[in-house]
C-alpha cells in the first residue's frame, strides 16, 4: 500500500514520541523566526509632509529599514481623501518589486506614510506575520469601499473585520510581487479596488495564500473603529490597544476622517510621551537662539476685534517681549472706535522702537477674516519675514520669552497654551465633534492643568500662534485661509491647515499667560476696566491692587499711627486715578447737604460732598473688593473678628476750600471703617488729614493708595482736617453697620 504504515504494537510509542507526526518525513520543529534584517518596509511619498516625517520618525525609533518610492515625482493618483485613486502607488510597487521577486526569504511590508505611525518594532511584526501562517496578510477593515456591491464575494468571517484595506499589507517578496504584477491600470485608478478584486477571487486568494488581519494584530485602521482603540500605558510604554480583540496593533492607520485621532495617538506612540519620562520628543529638532548672531525676522499681527478690557497693558506687553526690536514688524487691526485712543498712545511709544508699524482702523470696515488674511499676507509677501506671530487682544502674555520659546521649538505652526484663570477654557481643542466643533479629548484636562507637559499635535488652536514664513509661502500660500463656508475665521484656518496636512502644535512646557474674558465688557462707563473684578479677577488685581498688598501678610508692613488705627497699602496709582476720573466724569456731587434722598430717612447728620458707588453702578464691584481684599486685613489686625464684608454706605468724598474743606467730629455708623486716600498731599492739595479726638492723634500726610482702617461707632470719634488749597479725594466704606 502507498503512504505510511505503523505497526499496532508500536502505535502507542509513536503517538507518545510524535503526537503531531504520525507519518514519517513530517517536520516536527517550529519554523525559525525571520531575522529582522529580512524585513523591508516600503511606502510611497511624492512629497515630504508633516505626516511623512512623523512616520519616518516612528520607523527610525524601532530601527525599521524603509524604502520610499515616488520621491520627487508628481502625484497623479487623484484626491485620495474625497475620491477613488491611488493607483500610482501600485504602479510604483510593481516597478520596485521586480528587483525583489526572487528573494524568497525577504518579507516586504507596504504601508501608507502620511497617516500611519508604528507602535511596535520589526521583531513583533515578523512574529505576528509568521503566526498568521499565510504568504500575504492585508489590513482588515469593518467598512467596505469603494464598491459595496462586492460584499457577498468576501469570505464569511465570524470574528473580526471582514473587508480588505489596502493601506497596509505584509508578505514574502515573491508573493507580493505576484500580486502587484497584475496591475495594468492608470495612476488615478483605485488601488483599494485592485487589491480587493485580487483577494475576493478565490483562485488567486488560495494560490497566493492571502488572508486579512481580521483582529488587527498587525494593522489597525481607525476609520470605523474609533470606539475600539484606546491609549494604553504599561511598563513605561505607550501603545494603542484594540479593546474589541484585545490586541496591540503595530501599524496604526488614521485613514479617512480619523487623522485627528491618529494625531492624538501620535502624541504618545511610540513613547513620544510616557508617564515615567514625560515628553521624549520635545527637544527633537529644536533650535537655539542664544547661538545666533542675528535673530529671525518676525511680523506680529495684532487683532482687536471687539471691545477688550485692559488693552493698554496688552499693547505695552508687545514692547516688553524679550526679542530684538529691530527684527520686529507690527500689523495692527483695530475694529473698535472705542480703542482708537489706546492705539494712538501706543503708536506714539512704539514708533521709536519698531520701525514698521501698519495700522488698519475701524474706518476700513474689514471683516475679521479679511483682517486676518491681510495680517498673514503682511508676512507672506515679505521674503525676509521668517515668522508670523498672531496675537489677539484678549491674550495676556506674562512670559517675555514667549516668542523665543516658540521659535526655538521649530514647528511650522505652534501656539503657547493660554487659559482663562481658574477655568478649563483654553486656546486649543484636543478633539473635534463629527460636525467639526469642540469635543474634549481624553487628555485635555491634564494638558490644561499641567499634569501632562509637552508639545501636542492638536486639531484646533486660536488667539495666539506662530507660523513659519516659509510655510506661508509654500503649503499655505493661498491668501484666503480665514474664509471657509460659514466657519469662524479661526476654525477656517485650522480646517484648511488640517486638510493641507500641516500639523498644529500647542506647547504647555512653560507658563505663557492667560486669556481674558471679553463677553460682558461694558463700555458705557469712563474707565470700564474698574468693573472687571468678576470677569477677569487676576487682571483686575494686577491693575488696581497695590503691588505691596501681599506684604501685609508676609512682611508685617501694616502701620498703626494712632491706637487701633491701621494703615496699609491697598490701591495702585491707576486705581486711585481712575476712580477719581470716574466720579468726576459722573459729576453729580452731593454738595455736602443734610437732606440726602440717597440714604434711608433722607437726612445725613454729618454730610460730605460725595458720590455713592451705587450712583455709578459700582456698588457690587466695591463690596466684592471689600470681601476679597479688605476682609483678610481685618482678620489680621482685629484678631478673632470675621467681617461680613457688607456696607450700606460706600462713597468717594471730595474736599476743597470752595465746596467742603473739612468735616466736623463724628462717629461712623459702622463696626469698622476704611478710608482710602485717592491723591497726593503736597502735590494735589495742602492740608487735610484725619484727627482722632479721643486719642489726640492726627494723621496729616495720608499716602495715595493707602487705607486707614479703624473702629466706627463708640471708640473712634474723629474729624476731617481742613484742606487749605487744591482738591482732596478719599474713598470711604462703613463696613458691617
Curated annotation (Swiss-Prot):
SUBUNIT field: Homodimer.
UniProt cross-references to SMART domains, sorted A to Z: P4Hc (SM00702)
PROSITE patterns on file: FE2OG_OXY, LYS_HYDROXYLASE
Function of the molecule: Forms hydroxylysine residues in -Xaa-Lys-Gly- sequences in collagens. These hydroxylysines serve as sites of attachment for carbohydrate units and are essential for the stability of the intermolecular collagen cross-links.
Gene3D superfamilies per the UniProt record, alphabetical: q2cbj1_9rhob like domain, Spore Coat Polysaccharide Biosynthesis Protein SpsA, Chain A
Record-listed Fe cation binding positions: 666, 668, 718
Catalytic-site annotation from UniProt: 728
Molecular function terms from GO: iron ion binding; L-ascorbic acid binding; procollagen-lysine 5-dioxygenase activity
Pfam families: 2OG-FeII_Oxy (PF03171), GT_PLOD (PF25342)
KW Secreted (keyword) present: no
Associated disease: Bruck syndrome 2: An autosomal recessive disease characterized by generalized osteopenia, congenital joint contractures, fragile bones with onset of fractures in infancy or early childhood, short stature, severe limb deformity, progressive scoliosis, and pterygia. It is distinguished from osteogenesis imperfecta by the absence of hearing loss and dentinogenesis imperfecta, and by the presence of clubfoot and congenital joint limitations.
E.C. numbers: 1.14.11.4
Enzyme class (EC, first level): oxidoreductase
Tissue-specificity statement: Highly expressed in pancreas and muscle. Isoform 1 and isoform 2 are expressed in the majority of the examined cell types. Isoform 2 is specifically expressed in skin, lung, dura and aorta.
Keyword Membrane in record: yes
Chemical reaction(s) catalysed: L-lysyl-[collagen] + 2-oxoglutarate + O2 = (5R)-5-hydroxy-L-lysyl-[collagen] + succinate + CO2
Cellular localization per UniProt: Rough endoplasmic reticulum membrane
Superkingdom per UniProt: Eukaryota
Annotated positions of the Phosphotyrosine modification: 323
Source species of the chain: Homo sapiens
Name this protein carries in UniProt: Procollagen-lysine,2-oxoglutarate 5-dioxygenase 2
Amino acid at each position: 500500500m502507498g503512504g505510511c504504515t505503523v505497526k499496532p504494537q508500536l502505535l502507542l510509542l509513536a503517538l507518545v514520541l510524535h503526537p503531531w507526526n504520525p507519518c514519517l518525513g513530517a517536520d516536527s520543529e517550529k519554523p525559525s523566526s525571520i531575522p529582522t534584517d529580512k524585513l523591508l518596509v516600503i511606502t510611497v511619498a511624492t512629497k515630504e509632509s508633516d505626516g511623512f516625517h512623523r512616520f519616518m520618525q516612528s520607523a527610525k525609533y524601532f530601527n525599521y529599514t524603509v524604502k520610499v518610492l515616488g520621491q520627487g515625482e508628481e502625484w497623479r493618483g487623484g484626491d485620495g481623501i474625497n475620491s477613488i485613486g491611488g493607483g500610482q502607488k501600485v504602479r510604483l510597487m510593481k516597478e520596485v518589486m521586480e528587483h525583489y521577486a526572487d528573494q524568497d526569504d525577504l518579507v516586504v511590508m507596504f504601508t501608507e506614510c502620511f497617516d500611519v505611525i508604528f507602535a511596535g518594532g520589526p521583531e513583533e511584526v515578523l512574529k505576528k506575520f509568521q503566526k498568521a501562517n499565510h504568504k500575504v496578510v492585508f489590513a482588515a477593515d469593518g467598512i467596505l469601499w469603494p464598491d459595496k456591491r462586492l460584499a457577498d464575494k468576501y469570505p464569511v468571517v465570524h470574528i473580526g473585520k471582514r473587508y480588505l484595506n489596502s493601506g497596509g499589507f505584509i508578505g514574502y517578496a515573491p508573493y507580493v510581487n505576484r500580486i502587484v504584477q497584475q496591475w495594468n491600470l492608470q495612476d488615478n485608478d483605485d488601488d483599494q479596488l485592485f487589491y480587493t478584486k485580487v483577494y475576493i477571487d478565490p483562485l488567486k486568494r488560495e494560490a497566493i495564500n492571502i488572508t486579512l488581519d481580521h483582529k488587527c494584530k498587525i494593522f489597525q485602521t481607525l476609520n470605523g473603529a474609533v470606539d475600539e482603540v484606546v491609549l494604553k500605558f504599561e511598563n513605561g510604554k505607550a501603545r494603542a490597544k484594540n479593546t474589541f480583540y484585545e490586541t496591540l496593533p503595530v501599524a496604526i492607520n488614521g485613514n479617512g476622517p480619523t487623522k485627528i485621532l491618529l494625531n492624538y495617538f501620535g502624541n504618545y506612540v511610540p513613547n513620544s510621551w510616557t508617564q515615567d519620562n514625560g515628553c521624549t520628543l520635545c527637544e527633537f529638532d529644536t533650535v537655539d537662539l542664544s547661538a545666533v548672531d542675528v535673530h529671525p525676522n518676525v511680523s506680529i499681527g495684532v487683532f482687536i476685534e471687539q471691545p477688550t478690557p485692559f488693552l493698554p497693558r496688552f499693547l505695552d506687553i508687545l514692547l516688553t517681549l524679550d526679542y530684538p526690536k529691530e527684527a520686529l514688524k507690527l500689523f495692527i487691526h483695530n475694529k473698535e472706535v472705542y480703542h482708537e485712543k489706546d492705539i494712538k498712545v501706543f503708536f506714539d511709544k512704539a514708533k521709536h522702537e519698531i520701525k514698521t508699524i501698519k495700522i488698519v482702523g475701524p474706518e476700513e470696515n474689514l471683516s475679521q477674516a479679511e483682517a486676518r488674511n491681510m495680517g498673514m499676507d503682511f508676512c507672506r509677501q515679505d521674503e525676509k519675514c521668517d515668522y508670523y506671530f498672531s496675537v489677539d487682544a484678549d491674550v495676556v502674555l506674562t512670559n517675555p520669552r514667549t516668542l523665543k520659546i516658540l521659535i526655538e521649538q521649530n514647528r511650522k505652526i505652534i501656539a503657547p497654551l493660554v487659559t482663562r484663570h481658574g477655568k478649563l477654557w483654553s486656546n486649543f481643542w484636543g478633539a473635534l465633534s463629527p460636525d467639526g466643533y469642540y469635543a474634549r479629548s481624553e487628555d485635555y484636562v491634564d494638558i490644561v492643568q499641567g499634569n501632562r507637559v509637552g508639545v501636542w499635535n492638536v486639531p484646533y488652536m486660536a488667539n495666539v500662534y506662530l507660523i513659519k514664513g516659509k510655510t506661508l509661502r509654500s503649503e499655505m500660500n493661498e491668501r484666503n485661509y480665514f474664509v471657509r463656508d460659514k466657519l469662524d475665521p479661526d476654525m477656517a484656518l485650522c480646517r484648511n491647515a488640517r486638510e493641507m496636512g500641516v500639523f498644529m502644535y500647542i506647547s504647555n512646557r512653560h507658563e505663557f499667560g492667560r486669556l481674558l474674558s471679553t463677553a460682558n465688557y461694558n463700555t458705557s462707563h469712563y474707565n470700564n476696566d474698574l468693573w472687571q473684578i468678576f470677569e477677569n479677577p487676576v487682571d483686575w488685581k494686577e491693575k488696581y491692587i497695590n503691588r505691596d498688598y501681599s506684604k501685609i501678610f508676609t512682611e508685617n508692613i501694616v502701620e498703626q499711627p494712632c491706637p487701633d488705627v491701621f494703615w496699609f497699602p491697598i490701591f495702585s496709582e491707576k486705581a486711585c486715578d481712575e476712580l477719581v476720573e470716574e466720579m468726576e466724569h459722573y459729576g453729580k456731587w452731593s454738595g455736602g447737604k443734610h437732606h440726602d434722598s440717597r440714604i434711608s430717612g433722607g437726612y445725613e447728620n454729618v454730610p460730605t460732598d460725595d458720590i455713592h458707588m451705587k450712583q455709578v453702578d459700582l456698588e457690587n464691584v466695591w463690596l466684592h473688593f471689600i470681601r476679597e481684599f479688605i476682609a483678610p486685613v481685618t482678620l489680621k489686625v482685629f484678631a478673632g473678628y470675621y467681617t461680613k464684608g457688607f456696607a450700606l454706605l460706600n462713597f468717594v468724598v471730595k474736599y476743597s476750600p470752595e465746596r467742603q474743606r473739612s468735616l466736623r467730629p463724628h462717629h461712623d455708623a459702622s463696626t469698622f471703617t476704611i478710608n482710602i486716600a485717592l491723591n497726593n498731599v503736597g502735590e494735589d492739595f495742602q492740608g487735610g488729614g484725619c484727627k482722632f479726638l479721643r486719642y489726640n492723634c492726627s494723621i496729616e500726610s495720608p499716602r495715595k493708595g493707602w487705607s486707614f482702617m479703624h473702629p466706627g461707632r463708640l471708640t473712634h470719634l474723629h474729624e476731617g482736617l481742613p484742606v487749605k488749597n487744591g482738591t482732596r479725594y478719599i474713598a470711604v466704606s462703613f463696613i458691617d453697620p
